[in-house]
């Protein structure tokens, strides 16, 4: 073995050792040890793989880590080139992928990052209830760590928080597969943390979560009461944020309303942008059903879709589940046809969960007037009274959450105000709630009073 080859082998060994800081030892032995470093010329590392699958797998999963490790060893930012063997031509360098390479299912790349490719911005039905959150999510997906960091999405179960978080991750990976993205629930984060402590692999756990470019962590409220997990996530958050990495979180409440979480964590959740997703109005619920129906080769009467949309009001996941049940029954038993009576029978357990009476704007206005000790006539007047501004916005916000009326219809009930005023009120109160626990608690109390009386 000549000296040059020996030197190259030593350099490659150093690179592999450096890679162990960010990649498991098992992965190094499987994918990198069989690789041979042929040359280093003009800031290019020419590598030889024993089989095309090595090139494919490294390029798909570890290229950014390999470039980083090579930079730290060589003090230069190299381009990674794989040599191909061409019959009669010896080794030939190429920067292109081998066309004949059998590729694994595309979804496996996303699954390794905790992502499900069925969630996209294209199949997220946007309405007034979610347009601000959807716009913020798209901005983050287009420019990670430059638009809003962190982005905190909140709302009740089944309204689309997970869909938007997954869409962010999928969009980023589609645009640049080398960006390190990880979606995880806070429960998974906690379980991995506990397992790492038990196995003595806490260093590897920290490398996994502190070396990534985009962290999407769902259901952050699960960390409540878990002091050591909160401590670990606090330092993970700081490491990523200080490194200008994107953080997206979701919870069932605004940050200020989260219980049993450290104040220093809640404070960090509020550093960026908070965006609430509200229950969809009837127009959006109907649009969701029609969009979902496109996945089936069935034609269901619009009156049946309206029936479902009118009765399942607060949970998109439940709405979609009802349609799935209906379509399954129709395709198996009814040759694609189903009646309203059959729909009522099939969905009786879901429909029975819905409020039997409708909450009106007047009911909301009166409850808010009681809470703020103001006159009803001032609430609905056209006059601009500063003392009434906040209560009026609170009432508009609750009207968006608890009624099926459009923005314009709500505005009409507040002295003939336009839809833009209502939308502004919705966004303002949503933002205030994320930072004012007293306001968030008051709105929660009024909501409970209104819904429990139904």
Swiss-Prot record:
- Binding sites annotated in the UniProt record for ATP: 158, 160-162
Which keywords label this protein?
A: ATP-binding, Cytoplasm, DNA replication, DNA-binding, Lipid-binding, Nucleotide-binding
Q: Per the record, which residues fall in region Domain II?
A: 76-113
* Region annotation (Domain III, AAA+ region) ranges: 114-330
Molecular function, one GO term? ATP hydrolysis activity
UniProt-annotated stretches for the region Domain I, interacts with DnaA modulators:
1-76
Key word ATP-binding present: yes
UniProt entry tagged with the keyword Nucleotide-binding: yes
Q: Which GO terms describe its cellular component?
A: cytoplasm; plasma membrane
Where would you say this protein principally sits, based on its record?
cytoplasm
NCBIfam families found in the cross-reference section:
DnaA (TIGR00362)
Name of the protein described by the UniProt record: Chromosomal replication initiator protein DnaA
Give the source lineage, highest ranks first. Answer: Bacteria, Pseudomonadati, Verrucomicrobiota, Methylacidiphilae, Methylacidiphilales
Gene name linked to the record? dnaA
